[in-house]
Swiss-Prot record:
Matching Gene3D superfamilies: 3.40.1360.10
Origin superkingdom: Archaea
Native source organism of the sequence: Methanothermobacter thermautotrophicus (strain ATCC 29096 / DSM 1053 / JCM 10044 / NBRC 100330 / Delta H) (Methanobacterium thermoautotrophicum)
Pfam families in the record: Toprim (PF01751)
Residue numbers binding Mg(2+) 2: 74, 76
Residues annotated as domain Toprim: 23-105
Cofactor: Mg(2+)
GO molecular function: metal ion binding
InterPro entries reported for this sequence: TOPRIM_dom, TOPRIM_RNase_M5-like, UPF0292
Family label: Belongs to the UPF0292 family.
Ranges that cross the membrane: none
Co-factor remark: Binds two Mg(2+) per subunit.
Name by which UniProt lists this protein: UPF0292 protein MTH_890
Keywords for this protein: Magnesium, Metal-binding
Length: 138
């Protein structure tokens, strides 16, 4: 089970990496989320929602300058509310906000983590479940 979940999460992260490489902005909540995603190899253009002087409407306006935007807020109640609001605001501005990666990651990790910054440690835990012994000695 852990191997399948690990592969599914890896597939989603590969998709996120690809989208970022294509220049599609990724809306995240804050600095720690960006650090976690960079640790996982995602280097796309990030737009942070928290820790900025901009209002959500201004962030939505800035993000909607591109036709497509990925929303990847945390999986808790606050993150879900932010995702809904940003989705509505950007859609009304003519952008194509994408919640698919967030929904799939949330579905796979819901019982285990509640935020993006916890993804690297969760993935490491899954790797240990799949292969608990170091392979250096073989």
């Amino acid at each position: 089970m852990s191997l399948i979940k690990l592969q599914q999460i890896t597939d989603e992260l590969e998709e996120l990496k690809y989208q970022g490489e294509q220049g599609i902005p990724i809306l995240i909540e804050g600095r720690k989320d960006e650090e976690a995603l960079r640790e996982l190899g995602v280097n796309g253009p990030f737009i942070k929602v928290s820790g900025t002087r901009l209002s959500l409407s201004e962030i939505a306006l800035r993000a909607s300058r591109t036709s497509r935007v990925i929303i990847l807020t945390d999986f808790d109640r606050k993150g879900s509310e932010l995702a809904k609001r940003l989705y509505r605001d950007m859609q009304s501005l003519g952008a194509d906000p994408d919640l698919r990666i967030r929904r799939r990651l949330m579905g796979m990790t819901r019982r285990y983590i509640k935020d993006i910054q916890s993804l690297p440690s969760y993935i490491e835990r899954l790797k240990l479940e799949v292969c608990p012994y170091p392979l250096d000695n073989i």
